Amino acid sequence: MAGCGEIDHSLNMLPTNKKASETCSNTAPSLTVPECAICLQTCVHPVSLPCKHVFCYLCVKGASWLGKRCALCRQEIPEDFLDKPTLLSPEELKAASRGNGEYVWYYEGRNGWWQYDERTSRELEDAFSKGKKNTEMLIAGFLYVADLENMVQYRRNEHGRRRKIKRDIIDIPKKGVAGLRLDCDSNTVNLARESSADGADSGSAHTGASVQLPVPSSTRPLTSVDGQLTSPVTPSPDAGASLEDSFAHLQLSGDSIAERSHRGEGEEDHESPSSGRVPDTSTEETESDASSDIEDAPVVVAQHSLTQQRLLVSSANQTVAERSDRPVAGGGTMSVNVRSRRPDGQCTVTEV
């Protein structure tokens, strides 16, 4: 019995040891870095898309410029994914920012410097240590040339856009690593991205200050009353004058128009061109449209309208006088108050 128990005990221990070894073998592959299906290398700063496929962050960024879809399942990539990516290991980003050596490589961005990812930084350091003048880098599906003499980088097929690079110590202030910001609490969102896949700033940041464009104020030409220039934009001290004063000004200006109409052409006594115009009274309610006609019509037309209206007033007064001479049924005379309208818009009351 004891022997059987010992045998049974040894037999029970074998599967346990075997299971432990299997567990160790299963946990080892989980620590390996996944491979990227775009660059066909181990992922650098791996990110997980909503479809659960894993790629390098810069590879996803480069693919998003072309189709904004997953490279494997073609599911659409959200618009804000590049601004708020889902990192598999955020601690790796912080470790990469601290670096392994004394010097690392940076490229220029807006208002700061970005650190290259670890793989690209090793390639640049290797070329620099060997004394090469330039080297090529594959970043997000685009070939870049790093000019180590002039310390600039540019796309191999686009030499116009150049970006400064530098080799510096690890502890200098920087914005992030390979387009991934170190300050995760930043609320800055890139609204319009350019076609840049090297992890640089590719959009204009949204600022809280709003720029207001100056609105041009509508200006009106200067007008004159009795030869004095007045500005309709600036209120005059006599803005509160009564309608009678305004009508008096209109009458004076109307008479001056009539006087000038009798002069020949070129006989203006060096008067200013604007002295013959009447102030714009569109804001005041007049009882007739004759004043507005005088304001805009030429001198000849104004003279003709003045003469015609004077004839109408005189004929109306004559008709009223004839009617007043007729006897009334009561034996008295008829007293009529006639309200006439002068050409300048002023109303007068004539008692007959």
Curated annotation (Swiss-Prot):
GO terms for cellular component: cytoplasm; cytosol; nucleus. The keyword Cytoplasm applies. There is a cross-link at residues 84, 94, 130, 175 (Glycyl lysine isopeptide (Lys-Gly) (interchain with G-Cter in ubiquitin)). Its main location: cytoplasm. The modification Phosphoserine is found at residues 288, 292. Residues 215-233 have a biased composition (Polar residues). Residues 195-242, 259-293, 317-352 are annotated as: Disordered. Keywords: Cytoplasm, Isopeptide bond, Metal-binding, Nucleus, Phosphoprotein, Transferase, Ubl conjugation, Ubl conjugation pathway, Wnt signaling pathway, Zinc, Zinc-finger. Residues 282-293 have a biased composition (Acidic residues). A glycoprotein binds at residues 107, 110, 114, 144, 153, 163, 175. Transmembrane segments: none annotated. It comes from the Eukaryota. Can form homooligomers. Interacts with PARsylated AXIN1, AXIN2, BLZF1, CASC3, H1-2, IPO7, LIG3, NCL, PARP1, XRCC1, XRCC5 and XRCC6. Interacts with DDB1, DHX15, IQGAP1, LRPPRC, PARP2, PRKDC, RUVBL2, TNKS1 and TNKS2. Binding often leads to interactor ubiquitination, in the presence of the appropriate E1 and E2 enzymes, and proteasomal degradation. The WWE domain mediates non-covalent poly(ADP-ribose)-binding. This is E3 ubiquitin-protein ligase RNF146. It comes from Rattus norvegicus (Rat).
